[in-house]
Amino acid sequence: MSGCRILLDAGNSSLKWAVVEDGTWLARGRSDYSDLSAVEAELDAGSECFIASVASRVYEEKLAALLTAAGCSAVWLKSEAAFDDVTNDYRDPTQLGVDRWMGLVAARARRRAPTLVVSAGTAMTVDALSGDGSFLGGLIVPGVALMQRSLQQGTAGGAAAGGAWQAFPRCTADAAYSGIIAALCGAVEGQHVRLAAHEGISPACLITGGGAETLLPHLGVDAEHVPTLVLEGIERVARAGGRG
């Protein structure tokens, strides 16, 4: 695989990866940090690895050791003030999660118009991109599992685990789960309304992350599911020499 670029999206709970050569995506997958054998099989001395990480220090060290042992070069990407015609209006651009930044870079390449970028993972982010490519800001909301854990630990009776979506739930487990889904979808829908008012036009909506398929059937806005969004952003920055 020498000469290939390895793209690594190191999230809180899993590693998403892709192998790209001359603009062609050869392979991609998702691995738990407990078993990185699928990623290891793609590594070879001379491969360039570009990493966007919000993972814990322990997971980052495990990943770094794997890349070093394989003889790969590693570029750990950071959020910056601008890339191409995307500008990062965060109060301190370096404090924006690099996964969010890569998602915005990819979204701008896909849509030259106002766009809401939703990443539904361990936490859900809902980021607003203006028509001229300015990142206006965004929300961070606990994801489904975090909200469930909070209810179980923070209520006297402990909300029942599991549950299924019901428009009018009639048991505690369903009520808790349906409330979580409604809250997450409401965050997306509210930001969609606010971005439309700001831009004077209904924005596109792109959604990525492991929880996307859970939310999509319940969203009150049209959204395109793009599982590779963060990896696409990494690939664009990698082609530009690793500065994003």
From Swiss-Prot:
It comes from Thiobacillus denitrificans (strain ATCC 25259 / T1). The active site is at 99 (proton acceptor). Its cofactor is NH4(+); K(+). Catalyzes the phosphorylation of pantothenate (Pan), the first step in CoA biosynthesis. Its EC number is 2.7.1.33. It comes from the Bacteria. GO terms for molecular function: ATP binding; pantothenate kinase activity. The gene is coaX. This is Type III pantothenate kinase. ATP binds at residues 9-16, 122. Homodimer. Substrate binds at residues 90, 97-100, 172. Pfam families: Pan_kinase. It catalyses: (R)-pantothenate + ATP = (R)-4'-phosphopantothenate + ADP + H(+).
